[in-house]
Every structure is written in C-alpha cells, then in structure tokens.
C-alpha cells in the first residue's frame, strides 16, 4: 500500500482503496485473461507484505516505490535479492546493492548478486506457452 497500514480502512488515507485496489484488480484480471496463474493480493501494508513474502506466501512483492522495497529486501537477503523494474519496454533487473565503485579493479566484489540478476532476466525474457 501507499499510505501507512494501507490506509487503515480510510482512517489514514483513501488512496489505497480508491486508486491502488482498482489497479490491482485490473492487473489480476489481465493476468487471468492471459492464462497466468498468479496470486495477486493487495493493497497490503508494506511492513506486513515483506514479512509474509519472506515467510513464503508470495514469490515476489510489487512495491509502490524503490526504497519501500529495497530496505526489507536487503535486510532479508542482502547480496542475492534482485530488483526488477516494471513498465519498461525491456526486461531490466539489477543487483540489490549499489554500484560498488570502491571495489572496481580490486577483485574484491562478490558476483553472486549479478549472477542472480542475470538469471532472473533470462527467466523473465523466456517465451511462455500460451493457453
């Protein structure tokens, strides 16, 4: 959600109910129409969403903005989590940490994050069978 506690039933803002929930419903409908089997829930309070995802409820979380996602991702699995940018004409994945320019040329960087980002990009790019 956008507002604290996803709006707390309107007490802390109506955006989650009036703007975000209808968008999630449209996305859910489009996925079903495309034959994609996915659990699409929300809006969910950010502090709960990531705890539930790490616990296995979902395979991923779509966050409202960058820092809302990167902070819990780094706490849960720094180094091997992958950031995916949606809404672009290309598949874009990136490591969950910064550029690490201070490590350039020193052979001290761990490539696991880059490998995870490349693997996910390959998976997202793969053709999917249509129903």
Q: Predicted segments — roles?
A:
Residues 1-27:
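Active-site rim beta-loop-alpha module in soluble metabolic enzymes
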Residues 23-131:
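Glycine-rich phosphate/nucleotide-binding loop
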């Amino acid at each position: 959600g956008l507002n604290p506690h996803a709006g707390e039933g309107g007490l802390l803002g109506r955006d989650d109910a009036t703007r975000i929930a209808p968008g999630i419903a449209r996305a859910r409908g489009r996925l079903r129409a495309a034959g994609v089997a996915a659990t699409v829930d929300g809006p969910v309070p950010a502090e709960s969403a990531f705890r539930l995802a790490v616990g296995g409820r979902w395979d991923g979380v779509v966050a409202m903005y960058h820092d809302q996602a990167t902070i819990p991702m780094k706490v849960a699995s720094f180094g091997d989590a992958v950031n995916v940018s949606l809404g672009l004409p290309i598949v874009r994945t990136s490591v969950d940490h910064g550029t690490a320019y201070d490590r350039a040329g020193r052979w001290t960087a761990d490539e696991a994050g880059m490998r995870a980002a490349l693997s996910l990009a390959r998976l997202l790019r793969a053709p999917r069978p249509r129903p």
